[in-house]
């Protein structure tokens, strides 16, 4: 249900119904989240097919959101005892190599294309010279970009890209999103280790940094203090992975099955959560009609 809740949010559905390539990115992000949950929840050991699936998902990420290929690195931080054998575990490195090779081939091909709709102030070679000549100014711009990333998630409450924004929708939806990230019963058969959580934070930071650097080179005027083009929708995959870091239900509930210990009726609880998600989607859709029509 956690995957389903994030799958029917307003902005991802709106963009998925358009021509934008981010629809592909949203689908892959949901598949990766579901796969990681499955790796920690299934009784069977992690096998070759699991590594192949993650390799395919992250390889496809190359063609839509390149920084997100870093998610393949999470596989090597899953505890060794979750794998069928050491040999299976070491195949993760082959998967990482395949993803990197595909990314390099794509970059080589993509570099041959010339954008025709960029501002005249954008020049990658001159921007690189500026970075090496003014490292302090570049690091300042990058730090500002990193610190402002959480604010960019407000974009999930806009009506068509970044043009119209609802403060009321944001404030009313924030507690619901927070409850899903922190309190939704996410009790997996196998514990998410601190090492995996640390690697998750590292991968998230890497994705944010690389995204900002790419847009500084390709979309920001030479020497400008603010990185242009960074949008909250680019970090949808990171939003999905937050429950692994923020969820505290293992400290609240005791036992392996929420129904058995009488804490709550999971079936009814899930129906309520799904209904809330549908109501938010309906409300945002109605607001969109009010804005544009």
Tell me the role of every PLM-derived stretch.
Residues 12, 107-113, 186-189, 212-223, ...:
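Juxtamembrane "helix-exit" motif on the non-cytosolic side of transmembrane helices
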Residues 52-58, 84-109, 198-206, 272-277:
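Hydrophobic alpha-helical membrane-interfacial segments at the cytosolic entry of transmembrane helices
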Residues 18-25:
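Short acidic/glycine- and proline-prone juxtamembrane loop motifs at membrane-interface regions
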Residues 104-187:
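Membrane-lumen/periplasm interface segments of multi-pass, membrane-embedded glycan/lipid transferases
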Residues 112, 257-293:
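Transmembrane helical bundles and short interhelical boundary loops of multi-pass, membrane-embedded
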Residues 50-66, 71-77:
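Membrane-interface alpha helices of multi-pass inner-membrane proteins
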Residues 38-45, 70-99:
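Perimembrane helix-loop-helix junctions
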Residues 1-8:
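Transmembrane-helix signature of polytopic, membrane-embedded enzymes
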């Amino acid at each position: 249900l956690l995957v389903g809740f994030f799958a029917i949010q307003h902005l991802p559905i709106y963009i998925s119904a358009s021509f934008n390539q981010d629809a592909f990115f949203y689908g892959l992000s949901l598949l990766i989240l579901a796969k990681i949950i499955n790796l920690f929840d299934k009784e069977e050991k992690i096998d070759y097919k699991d590594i192949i699936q993650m390799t395919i998902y992250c390889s496809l990420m190359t063609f839509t959101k390149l920084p997100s290929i870093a998610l393949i690195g999470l596989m090597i931080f899953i505890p060794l005892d979750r794998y069928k054998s050491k040999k299976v575990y070491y195949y993760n490195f082959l998967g990482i190599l395949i993803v990197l090779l595909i990314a390099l081939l794509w970059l080589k091909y993509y570099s041959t294309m010339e954008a025709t709709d960029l501002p005249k102030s954008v020049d990658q070679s001159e921007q690189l010279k500026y970075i090496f000549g003014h490292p302090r100014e570049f690091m300042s711009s990058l730090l500002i970009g990193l610190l402002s990333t959480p604010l960019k998630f407000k974009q999930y409450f806009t009506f068509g890209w970044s043009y119209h924004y609802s403060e009321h929708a944001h404030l009313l939806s924030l507690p619901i999103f927070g409850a899903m990230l922190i309190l939704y019963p996410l009790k997996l058969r196998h514990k998410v280790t601190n090492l995996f959580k640390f690697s998750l934070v590292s991968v998230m930071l890497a994705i944010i940094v690389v995204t900002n650097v790419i847009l500084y080179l390709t979309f920001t005027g030479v020497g400008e203090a603010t990185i242009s083009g960074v949008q909250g929708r680019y970090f949808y995959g990171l939003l999905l992975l937050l429950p692994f870091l923020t969820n505290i239900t293992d400290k609240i509930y005791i036992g392996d099955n929420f129904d058995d210990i009488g804490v709550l009726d999971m079936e009814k609880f899930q129906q309520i959560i799904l209904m809330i998600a549908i109501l938010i989607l309906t409300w945002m859709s109605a607001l969109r009609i009010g804005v544009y029509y």
